[in-house]
From Swiss-Prot:
Enzymatic class: transferase
Pfam family, one: CTP_transf_3
Annotated organism of origin: Mesorhizobium japonicum (strain LMG 29417 / CECT 9101 / MAFF 303099) (Mesorhizobium loti (strain MAFF 303099))
Name of the featured protein: 3-deoxy-manno-octulosonate cytidylyltransferase
One cellular-component annotation, GO: cytosol
Amino acid sequence: MSTLILIPARMASTRLPGKPLADISGAPMIVHVARRAAEAGLGRVVVATDTQSVAEAVRAHGFEAVMTRIDHESGSDRIHEALAALDPGRKVETIVNVQGDLPTIDPGIIAASLRPFEDAAVDIATLGVEIVREEEKTNPNVVKIVGSPLSATRLRALYFTRATAPWGEGPLYHHVGLYAYRRSALERFVALKPSPLERRERLEQLRALEAGMRIDAEIVRSLPLGVDTPQDLERARTILSN
């Protein structure tokens, strides 16, 4: 199975402008993400960006970058454009979308994202981590996976929500926003219009579920730090300086 890892990066973050180039231990944040993606050992790693300075920084550190349009509404749209430019011969079968603001991500969980594709019925694969901190259960910024257990380490996703769900006894799962797509699934997904539940929850993945696509989540133990604020950036600097 030929795999391409794509890392979408844009400079226009509302809470932390310019974060792809934020310095962490002497290298831009986007380069740390690319290094960890390469360590996953799945295949080619390319940063997809709309900003020339990001592309130049990535290339200066020995990684590939491809320029994309500036008007994309989502990372999925950006990686779809990048895929078409990088693989016109359609040799790539699976695409892993690694967010560009995860500089501490464990390469092992990037590799784990492909495991659900052992089932040919799965269109999109993603990751989840069991929630252990009580405050995360009610935090709307922590997206939860509501799913049917397939094994001790896998769920079939039925819904994603910012609410505390499901109700009752049992574990809750924190969704890690990393996606692996079969090529046909990515092409179908980006052709869909935003869905009602997607708009309501502000969660793009609900578009796929509402269209009848299957998403399975591999349950892992490592939760990467998403860098969205100056405070997150300082935490990442502390983690990566050790």
